[in-house]
Amino acid sequence: RRQRQMCIRDRVRIDALTTSIKEHAGRDFNLNSPTQLGEILFGEMKLVEKPKKTKTGQFKTDEQTLSSLAGKHPMIDEILEYREASKLKSTYIDALPEHVVSQTGRVHTHFHQLVAATGRLASTDPNLQNIPVRTEAGREIRKAFVPRGDGFTLLAADYSQVELRVMAAMSGDKGMIEAFQQDLDIHQATAARVYDVPLDEVLPEMRSTAKMVNFGIIYGISAFGLSQRLGIPRTEAAEIIETYFEKYPGVREFMDHIIDETKENGYVETLTGRRRQLRDITSSNQNIRGNAERAAINTPIQGSAADLIKLAMIHIDAFLREAGARTKMILQVHDELVFDLHRDEEDDLVPAIVKRMQDALPLPHGVHAKVDTGTGANWLEAH
């Protein structure tokens, strides 16, 4: 029933967006044709002075290009919304009912251990790890995931800032470790350091920039990449990154050490000793070498976080079986575990689950994993 309601709402929204976009254009055209869309946006409407082009000479209309133009014209925003709504409809709203197994009446995703090079689990048929939570349509889809019946509720147990905690632990950076030990908002704490202001004077835009840098550093973000994401000059982005490393010197030392060690060994390791071969780190090709260096930085962090949650899953599964619990672990979404929780077991099981998640893999330098939990009548409400 909820799926039918979502399907109708999404179809109505897509139709409304289609009509509005074509009114802006002043004529009918195929919204799904990059060539036609580019010609209207940049050839006819001339929304940008010097629009980017592909190697074949067509105007670029990919998500990154259009996202960088968001707010310049209502049509751009509506096209981005149209694309997201269309993707959600085809990927989830229309497709999920086809994945319901007749014998159980449930959707059963497939997990793969050898798809992501860092060791993260991947989900397919259907992919339940990629349902957006920041959009209204994505939230509606999450509402469709409910417990098995009366007496049950959904429990979401989510590692808090796990990759940044792993980076603090592996780098041994005193400032970052201190922020976590004091249970500070790490993005607010980083903003206070980078902008040299007291914690209570950090503005929302400062925190937003710090958040982008915190996560970007894990993936080896460049000054150019940060400037593109924040819409600021490259020189300003470079200054922010440099200040970040001045405030967190242990992070820079860790990254330099990891790259040097990987060049020497040809591989990088997670906290559990799981290795990823990175022979390209000594390549004479700058682009290939750069990609390998970013992987060398990211793999120990993301890979150790992946090891942590998989070890937690093993411990929790064994615990639930031994306890004869009616509660079942039903889904893993990177840093989150979802349970079909029997209400009578909530008081005993939730603390036990949290403890096993926190203790699954001891982190160096006194850094502790933190787990946030929530329950609800559906997956959305559990957050």
Locations of the language-model features?
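Conserved "right-hand" nucleotidyltransferase catalytic core of DNA-directed polymerases
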Residues: 1-5, 9-136, 146-153, 160-163, ...
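Hydrophobic alpha-helix feature that most strongly marks membrane-spanning transmembrane helices
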Residues: 11, 15, 26, 42, ...
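C-terminal polymerase-core module
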Residues: 16-19, 23-77, 246-298, 344-383
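Conserved, non-catalytic sequence blocks in retroelement Pol enzymes and Pol-derived host proteins
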Residues: 31, 179-181, 301
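Conserved catalytic core of nucleic-acid polymerases
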Residues: 101, 107-109, 113-116, 192-326, ...
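Flexible glycine/proline-rich, aromatic-decorated loop/lid segments
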Residues: 133-140, 182-189, 283-285
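Gly/His-enriched, cation/cofactor- and phosphate-binding structural elements
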Residues: 139, 152-153, 162, 326-328, ...
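Conserved catalytic alpha/beta cores of large enzymes that bind or transform nucleotide phosphates
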Residues: 142-167, 178-211
